[in-house]
Curated annotation (Swiss-Prot):
Pathway: Sulfur metabolism; hydrogen sulfide biosynthesis; hydrogen sulfide from sulfite (NADPH route): step 1/1
Reactions catalysed: hydrogen sulfide + 3 NADP(+) + 3 H2O = sulfite + 3 NADPH + 4 H(+)
Cofactor(s) recorded in Swiss-Prot or TrEMBL: siroheme; [4Fe-4S] cluster
The name this protein goes by in its record: Sulfite reductase [NADPH] hemoprotein beta-component
Record text on subunit structure and interactions: Alpha(8)-beta(8). The alpha component is a flavoprotein, the beta component is a hemoprotein.
MF annotations from Gene Ontology: 4 iron, 4 sulfur cluster binding; heme binding; metal ion binding; NADP binding; sulfite reductase (ferredoxin) activity; sulfite reductase (NADPH) activity
Binding site for siroheme: 482
EC number: 1.8.1.2
Origin species: Buchnera aphidicola subsp. Acyrthosiphon pisum (strain APS)
Binding site for [4Fe-4S] cluster: 433, 439, 478, 482
Amino acid sequence: MNKKFKKIVTEKKLTDAERIKENSNYLRGTITDDLKNEITNGFTGDNFSLIRFHGMYQQDDRDLRIERNEQKLEPRYAMMLRCRLPGGVIKAKKWLKIDYFASKYTLYGTIRLTNRQTFQFHGILKKNLKDVHKMLHSIGLDSLATANDVNRNVLCTSNPMESLIHQEAYEWARKISNFLLPHTKAYAEIWLDQKKIVTTEKEPILGKTYLPRKFKTTVVIPPYNDVDLYANDMNFVAITKNEKIIGFNILIGGGLSFIHGNKNTWPFLATEIGYISVENTLSIAKAIVTTQRDWGNRTDRANAKTRYTINNFGLNEFKKEIEKRANVNLKPVREYSFISRGDRFGWIKDINNNWSLTLFIQNGRIYDDNDKLFKSGLLKIANIHDGNFRITSNQNIIISEVSEKNKNKIEKIALSSGLINKSTNLRKNSMACVSFPTCPLAMAEAERMLSFFITQLENIMLKYGVEDEVIILRVSGCPNGCGRSLLAEIGLIGKSIGRYNLYIGGNRIGNRIPKIYKENITEQEILIHLKYLIKTWSNERKNKEDFGDFIVRKEFVKEVINPVYDFWS
């Protein structure tokens, strides 16, 4: 361990987030008191942060802020709740209750699929929170540890029934998720009214003050990188033999968030550290998490994530500590490669001769509006489907394990409700975070602007004869990275209302960070620049060259090789 760095860190004052965790009594705080408080619809003091460990964020409708302020009213507080759903798999019949709750108990009546393979509700009033937790519990689900300084929802390559390997990988995602969960009984006591029976508690893996920052994990089956592994803290890349997983390549330290203007923050790709046999999976997971727990920076949250810890101590030192704690020697990385990270839309036959139908859900927003009857369509499918729904890391949904007798019925519903539609490859490979009106961190629109923006970009691509090509396009309303714009070929990151930084030069498979091309420009200015770039790409690319590769080859931006030094240069 770098003793000099350790001394500097320990001499600094811990962040207030650390005080909150230390004093929380294992995430209880005074949340139960706030639930009884009818004067405000929000949570107060430390509880505002603590509810995140229970899977909720306090938000307000930013479209109404000024109006409510003028009326001397508090903001329209409501909670966003995110379900824990490792691998994104849920029984179709369970969807019936999820749909019912969204319709009856949320302000917006929608369900949002996320790029972390789960769903979330927006607009839950405080008085309805216990109802949603009890509803989730009744169908075997919860929202524990889907936010704040813990291991978040574990991702897994989609459609695990496509092969025995997919099913095995999904089971590992579940095992890792359960293994790294907080042990506190606070969630059950507060939301499910279970009596406290344990007088002393311990968190053997996460510790009393949990992790320094959020921590994200994936399980990946090459050649598909649909989970965007390079954006995650801890990754298990499956190595197989005879249709069985025999081990994992381990990659650590990925992450995309940064702060505008703060050159001490930067995105970073997860880095290979070695190979393990499958029986060492949980011990390695524990070693990585506890090393980050103990070595991570608790004095500066902007530099608290795993990638900064590795940068501070050095990759070799971090790796040695993992091996020491796990009592495992990491072997050389085994060969693997990726060919894409998009979803495969349409029907696919699985290992049991059943069918899976992958549906494109733009921005993951499930709602009903005019010809888009996504919500009622999925409800109709859930009523007749005996299998699963599988949420993908691209915010789409797979109707899986469809029997031959139900295949035509489900297809008819999907067609009539607009769930099967003719979308361009550009649109199908786009993504946006939620942003306005509910995200308190949003600087610019994302989800609400994306569809119209894509339509204009589609017209440009049509004009230059590349309308069928794939370009990875992503929009984030702020630099926190939720929309994964910094793994896109074209990435927009909000700077202020109507203005974005334009990043270009990422690649198709998601292992190159794009670089800023233009700063603080409007949507129309972005389209002007992209029109020129797409025209040039159409005329000068070599051998069906991807857009991002062309951008780097022609040096419209310099390739980001080590973002610690060249992301900002």
